[in-house]
């Protein structure tokens, strides 16, 4: 029986029972952090780390993934992140993901810690090498971007549709000039 630690074998073999997990918006200055978990029904071509794909390609793959998988997308608001803390939100997300999917599945989270949640393995940069984690990465990123595009209409000066709430120079300049809005994470260093 292969384990999740047999990474080279996982790269060459599709595991129908593997749930890939990733998040997007973890380091954003505003808006939600999205966590996604994905169990693919079949091997899909073109999947890789969402950060390496164009926005158009991510959106195309998003549609393919949701039609060919069992998935879960969770959102943690900036208020939840400020109140509970990022680690607690991540831990809660991992627990909800485990509860959503059956226990006989294997869980692989992109990163270096499972935050103490038993049964969840981790691998740094898994989103670049494991299809299910790549799929989760795409689901989380596209979901985060859609939310920020929607919220940008109510907060036009912050240009969330462009910066997706990350700490770009232009975003920080707007914060310095106009202050923060209700979407900003007050527990983060914003300037």
UniProtKB/Swiss-Prot annotation:
Gene3D superfamilies: Ribonuclease H-like superfamily/Ribonuclease H. GO terms for molecular function: manganese ion binding; RNA binding; RNA-DNA hybrid ribonuclease activity. CDD domains: RNase_HII_bacteria_HII_like. Belongs to the RNase HII family. It is found in: Cytoplasm. Its cofactor is Mn(2+); Mg(2+). GO terms for cellular component: cytoplasm; ribonuclease H2 complex. Pfam families: RNase_HII. Residues 16-191 form the RNase H type-2 domain. It comes from the Bacteria. NCBIfam families: PRK00015.1-3. The lineage of its organism: Bacteria, Pseudomonadati, Campylobacterota, Epsilonproteobacteria, Campylobacterales. Keywords: Cytoplasm, Endonuclease, Hydrolase, Manganese, Metal-binding, Nuclease. The keyword Metal-binding applies. GO terms for biological process: DNA replication, removal of RNA primer; mismatch repair. This is Ribonuclease HII. Endonuclease that specifically degrades the RNA of RNA-DNA hybrids. It comes from Campylobacter jejuni subsp. doylei (strain ATCC BAA-1458 / RM4099 / 269.97). A divalent metal cation binds at residues 22-23, 110. Its EC number is 3.1.26.4. PROSITE patterns: RNASE_H_2. It catalyses: Endonucleolytic cleavage to 5'-phosphomonoester. Manganese or magnesium. Binds 1 divalent metal ion per monomer in the absence of substrate. May bind a second metal ion after substrate binding. The keyword Cytoplasm applies.
């Amino acid at each position: 029986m292969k384990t999740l630690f047999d990474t080279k074998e996982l790269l060459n073999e599709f595991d129908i029972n593997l749930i890939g997990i990733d998040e997007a918006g973890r380091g954003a200055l505003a808006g939600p952090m999205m966590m996604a978990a994905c169990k693919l029904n079949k091997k899909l071509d073109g999947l890789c780390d969402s950060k390496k794909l164009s926005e158009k390609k991510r959106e195309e793959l998003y549609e393919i993934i949701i039609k060919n998988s069992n998935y879960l997308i969770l959102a943690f608001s900036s208020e939840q992140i400020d109140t509970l803390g990022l680690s607690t939100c991540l831990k809660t997300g991992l627990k909800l993901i485990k509860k959503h999917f059956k226990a006989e599945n294997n869980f692989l989270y992109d990163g270096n810690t499972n935050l103490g949640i038993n049964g969840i393995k981790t691998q740094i940069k898994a989103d670049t090498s494991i299809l299910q984690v790549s799929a989760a990465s795409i689901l989380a990123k596209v979901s985060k971007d859609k939310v920020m595009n929607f919220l940008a209409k109510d907060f036009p000066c912050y240009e969330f549709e462009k910066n997706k709430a990350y700490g770009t120079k232009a975003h920080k300049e707007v914060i310095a000039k106009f202050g923060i809005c209700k979407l900003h994470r007050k527990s983060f260093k914003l300037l």
